[in-house]
Amino acid sequence: MMISCTRTAILPLRRRLMTASTAYPIKFASSIIPGYGRGSADLGIPTANIPIDDVPVLDALDTGIYYGLVQILKTDKPSEKKTSEFQKDRVVDFQYTNKLNDQEINAVLPMVMSVGWNPFYKNDQKSAEIHIIHKFAHTFYGASIKVMVLGYLRPEKNFTSLEALVDEIHNDIKVSEEKMEGTREKKDQFWQ
């Protein structure tokens, strides 16, 4: 697994948290795992969840909302059923990239990412959830991805209602799109 950061000597990260003023971009590769199933079901905002323990730079980041770019890599594996890490009674169909179209595979797409505890839902595990700003017809659990975090939008916070949470996420998406308009990072060697 490749992890990169523009800071020098990033390890050990856990004692030296990376903050909103961290040097960007932060680049890493990972795979998509099932989460709690709330992004699509409760919020109407599907997320690609990343195993935070496998990407030390994510665990070292301040909790909050980040923006950047993501690329879903072609994953040649047959579909299979697996149990969700977050909900042991939930069996998920791992499609990898089998049902994605050619324009979605390897495309560099904008994203917003939540890193934290999701106080509205009172999570007991820290998570990293990426909302890719694109409408997908199918899921792609198990797919490999590359992620480039370009900046920090805001700290993690609690909300008084589900509607307030959804409104804030939509605002995060809007701000993220504005910040990334015309970004040259889409042509970075990282995506090759």
From Swiss-Prot:
Gene Ontology terms describing biological process: FMN biosynthetic process; riboflavin biosynthetic process; riboflavin metabolic process
Reaction(s) the record says it catalyses: riboflavin + ATP = FMN + ADP + H(+)
Lipid metabolism keyword on record: no
EC category name: transferase
Active site per database record: E129 (nucleophile)
Pathway in which the depicted protein is active: Cofactor biosynthesis; FMN biosynthesis; FMN from riboflavin (ATP route): step 1/1
Required co-factors: Zn(2+); Mg(2+)
List of residues binding Mg(2+): T47, N49
Pfam families: Flavokinase
Similarity annotation: Belongs to the flavokinase family.
Primary role: Catalyzes the phosphorylation of riboflavin (vitamin B2) to form flavin mononucleotide (FMN) coenzyme.
Name of protein: Riboflavin kinase
Native species: Yarrowia lipolytica (strain CLIB 122 / E 150)
